[in-house]
Amino acid sequence: MKTSILILAAGLGTRIKSQKPKVLQELCQKSMILHILKKAFALSDDVSVVLSHQKERVEKEILEYFPKTQILEQDLQNYPGTAGALSGFEPKNERVLILCGDMPLVEQTSLEALLGNNAKLNLAVFKARDPKSYGRVVIKNDSVEKIVEFKDANTQEKEINTCNAGVYVIDSRLLKELLPLIDNNNAAKEYYLTDIVKLAKEKDVMIKAVFVDEDEFMGINDKFELSIAENFMQKKIKKYWMQQGVIFHLPQSTFIGADVEFVGECEVYENVRIEGKSKIINSIIKSSSVIENSIVENSDVGPLAHLRPNCELKNTHIGNFVECKNAKLNTVKAGHLSYLGDCEIDSGTNIGCGTITCNYDGVKKHKTIIGKNVFVGSDTQFIAPVKIEDEVIIAAGSTVSINVEKGALFINRAGHKMIKDYYYKKFQK
């Protein structure tokens, strides 16, 4: 049975206390709406998102990554509430899966299990450790009797710990029949989607409660819950990669972005941060290193190294306090305390301590190209644009501002001066 998916993302999200819309808040470097859209498009090609607050901003991000998404706008003034979000929604398929845009931890397998039930109305519920302000679900004889919003619950109903996860699977024809019957006769004067349960019950529709994991189906309303969710997602990301063979030393101290990829045998030490679309292939990342949108293959990085965006390392050693940016290094050793930016360095080259590629002239960036088997002495500055041919020796302390031909020794130092007995003249009388 084909499914249309509707994601509710029109709320103001005032408790998140941010100028950025709630659904654009990031977990593991990806906004929560993108996390849920990835799961949605894995299940259906008919996916719609309901927006209102900062619609243009949210729509732009959604369509950048998921251009086939249908965008709907909720009229919050005339049709507030979760049921009001469905006005104007026309599903293309036999049933509808309704999701919340602030629920990024939901797994595709859990949604598949929810869709696997053939009841006309399925409701995701969970046993809450602390029910807080969740809507309470009253179940009788394995069928949902009603959902009571916390604002409208009486004292007895507030004692119930079975709560509404806010995820529904409903027959499209049933939805079309019941939606116009929902009213706003409640404390908040809103149109509640939860009322669809009461209306379905009045028509003797069997409503199936499907129990799900509370942590996985948590909604995010403030920055504290955002941090809890990100921590939960980090554990899942690292667990997945460890099951694929990656070794993490002290994994609770590392951060791995949602789009990071590991291939082969990799090892990650404590306090490492790997971001963006970085790809680590058969490599070791040592303590307290940061890698951003870079590819590391058959290499070791760190400790205390920083690979900024667009670095490509192959068969290379990057040591402590080395920073690279937009650098392609193939079979290179850069052991310590260097900046290698906007450069290409070829195989067999050794970069001495204190080497800097001076890539910025105050207006634009320039490139340094270093060939094969080059020995770069300590405290060398390359003034880009500059090209060093193969098999060159750069003497320590040199400032290189011209191209250097193959096989040459380059030395550029100020003249030496030594004043005999100067110490005694200065400090002894």
Swiss-Prot record:
Example of a GO MF term: magnesium ion binding
- Gene Ontology biological process terms, A to Z: cell morphogenesis; cell wall organization; lipid A biosynthetic process; peptidoglycan biosynthetic process; regulation of cell shape; UDP-N-acetylglucosamine biosynthetic process
Chain positions covered by the region annotation N-acetyltransferase? 245-429
Where along the chain is the active site annotated?
H336
Q: Please list where the region (Pyrophosphorylase) is annotated.
A: 1-223
Which residues participate in acetyl-CoA binding?
Answer: N359, Y360, S378, A396, R413
Its EC top class is transferase
- Pathway(s) served: Nucleotide-sugar biosynthesis; UDP-N-acetyl-alpha-D-glucosamine biosynthesis; N-acetyl-alpha-D-glucosamine 1-phosphate from alpha-D-glucosamine 6-phosphate (route II): step 2/2; Nucleotide-sugar biosynthesis; UDP-N-acetyl-alpha-D-glucosamine biosynthesis; UDP-N-acetyl-alpha-D-glucosamine from N-acetyl-alpha-D-glucosamine 1-phosphate: step 1/1; Bacterial outer membrane biogenesis; LPS lipid A biosynthesis
Name the CDD domains for this protein: GT2_GlmU_N_bac
Q: How is the cofactor bound?
A: Binds 1 Mg(2+) ion per subunit.
NCBIfam families attached here?
glmU, PRK14359.1
Q: How would you summarize the oligomeric state and partners of this protein? A: Homotrimer.
Q: What is this protein called?
A: Bifunctional protein GlmU
Q: What is the lineage of its organism?
A: Bacteria, Pseudomonadati, Campylobacterota, Epsilonproteobacteria, Campylobacterales
What's the name of its gene? glmU
